[in-house]
Swiss-Prot record:
SUPFAM superfamilies reported in the protein's UniProt record: Glucocorticoid receptor-like (DNA-binding domain) (SSF57716), P-loop containing nucleoside triphosphate hydrolases (SSF52540)
Binding site for ATP: 126-133
Protein name: ATP-dependent Clp protease ATP-binding subunit ClpX
GO MF: ATP binding; ATP hydrolysis activity; ATP-dependent protein folding chaperone; protein dimerization activity; unfolded protein binding; zinc ion binding
Transmembrane domains' residue ranges: none
One Pfam family named in its UniProt record: ClpB_D2-small
Organism: Clavibacter sepedonicus (Clavibacter michiganensis subsp. sepedonicus)
Superkingdom in the source lineage: Bacteria
Length: 426
């Protein structure tokens, strides 16, 4: 490129048409010319486009307030008020931090340069109580990429199993390989209690699926630029990698932590003196998980560095019969509504008597499967009738009774003709 000086021919900008005498500079290219004013205008357009793209990929979205997030969770998740409240605040603060980072700089406020640390979440509670569903619903409300990983499949680098970087690959896939969007997503790591250290004291033998995995997770939990193999599997030196910055990825790690309640109860029942002495209580609360302290998690088998990267700790409680009844009918996508919709697609109404719903909830409590077991029970009850209904055009309504659940009795069938006669007489 060359600057055009004075010449016999009067040259013009190929974009705005101004002559070389009307502008300060005219830059020549192969058969075209551009003036300094058009260059400046192009720079402004490029900056605006880049800023718009940055807003879309770095968290500049309509961030709902904690009460709005809580209200949305309330529409889908029954009970677990404390967990919903804690998650609403934690998620709001996380994405508020992401927004600050994208507009101000690397996690610093203007002037005082206060660094805003990331707050990942540890979710503790029995199986079937809605831990995974809470995280899925959060991601749905925020419209961010969401990935679920199983901690039991992970092993330390160099051993048979999955590397921790494969977790990030799932998030990238959930974002349709939009890395920038994935970098503000949510990763839910389940069964994290299964990677607890096998013994309270460090062992001289290698614990590749326990403490080793905790060590491997530290960096991505805290925030690092990880090299992710695009096809998954083990890394090898002759492959290309996707670079993913986990600084703004929210990690929600969860587990049932069976046996943790005994550790908490043992600590709460001890006597001592000084600042570390527990308060004496005559009896423990039913929700003993709500009393968990970092020292209990350490005794369970989580290393201190891992605990330190999960500053927000919240718990979910065992669901009782009343809560399970509400889960069947109240949420926007309640199980009963889902099955009623499936029957509607065959032109059949599905009705549940109150006694049937109570019996389904009682069975789930008895089996200790929580909300996850409700669908299995409904499949057992409705399976035979769902086999027959598509082939029988005479059926207009199916009524599930208590006997249908408890004694495997056939449901009450209302013929379509009877329903039509009742409608005409009405």
């Amino acid at each position: 490129m060359a600057r055009i000086g004075e010449s016999a021919d009067l040259l013009k900008c190929s974009f705005c048409g101004k002559s070389q005498k009307q502008v300060q500079q005219l830059i020549a290219g192969p058969g075209v010319y551009i003036c300094d004013e058009c260059v400046e205008l192009c720079n402004e357009i490029i900056e605006e486009r880049l800023a718009e793209a940055s807003e879309e990929t770095t968290g500049e979205f309509d961030l709902p307030k904690p009460k709005e997030i809580f209200g949305f969770l309330d529409e889908y998740v029954i009970g677990q008020e404390a967990a919903k409240r804690a998650l609403s605040v934690a998620v709001y603060n996380h994405y508020k931090r992401v927004r600050a980072v994208s507009t101000i700089g690397p996690a610093k406020t203007v002037g005082d340069e206060i660094e805003i640390a990331k707050s990942n979440i540890l979710l503790i509670g029995p199986t079937g109580c809605g831990k995974t569903y809470l995280a899925q619903t959060l991601a749905k409300r925020l419209n961010v990429p969401f990935a679920v990983a199983d901690a039991t499949a992970l092993t330390e680098a160099g051993y048979v199993g999955e590397d921790v970087e494969n977790i990030l690959l799932k998030l990238i896939q959930a974002a349709d390989y939009d890395v920038k969007r994935a970098e503000t997503g949510i990763i839910y790591i389940d069964e994290v209690d299964k990677i607890a250290r096998k013994a309270e004291n460090p062992s001289i033998t290698r614990d590749v699926s326990g403490e080793g995995v905790q060590q491997a997770l530290l960096k991505i939990l805290e925030g690092t630029v990880a090299s992710v193999p695009p096809q998954g599997g083990r890394k090898h030196p002759h492959q290309e990698f996707i670079q993913v910055d986990t600084t703004n990825v929210l990690f929600i790690v969860a587990g049932a932590f069976a046996g943790l309640e005994d550790i908490i109860s043992q600590r709460a029942g001890k006597k001592g003196i000084g600042f570390g002495a527990p308060l004496h209580r005559k009896d423990l609360n039913a929700d003993v998980f709500g009393e968990v302290l970092p020292e209990d998690l350490h005794k369970f088998g989580l290393i201190p560095e891992f605990i330190g990267r999960l500053p927000v700790v919240t718990t979910v409680t065992q669901l009782d019969q009343r809560a399970l009844m509400e889960i069947l009918t109240k949420p926007r996508n309640a199980l009963v509504r889902q099955y009623q919709r499936m029957f509607e697609l065959d032109g059949v109404e599905l009705e549940f008597e109150q006694g049937a719903l109570e019996s389904i909830a009682d069975l789930a409590v008895l089996r200790q499967t929580g909300a996850r077991g409700l669908r299995a029970i409904l499949e057992e009850v409705l399976g035979p009738i769902m086999f027959d209904i598509p082939s029988d055009d005479e059926v207009g309504r199916v009524v599930i009774t208590r006997e249908s659940v408890v004694q495997n009795a056939a449901p009450t069938i209302v013929p379509r003709a009877s329903m039509l006669r009742a409608e005409k007489s009405a």
